[in-house]
Amino acid sequence: MKTNEILHDEFLSVVETQLKSNNPPETKQTYERLISLGISDKDAKIYIAQCVASEIFHTIKHKRPYDEQRYIRNLNNLPDFPAE
């Protein structure tokens, strides 16, 4: 599947905002953990962006509010792909 560059950039923008604002703090903790595993800066942010995308998709598909706890569980499971 071809990457939608606009969505890709927007998801990465969300990650950058979360890292700068430290909100939620688990985003920065996850980023630092991924870096410590030898994952590059770019790839660590892409992994986190996958969690952002998964949460947005889940919210739209199920017509439910954003679930920060699910998002954090997915962050904690990285570098494995989001499970929920």
Task: Give residue spans per PLM region.
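Structure-specific DNA junction-binding interface
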Residues: 1-84
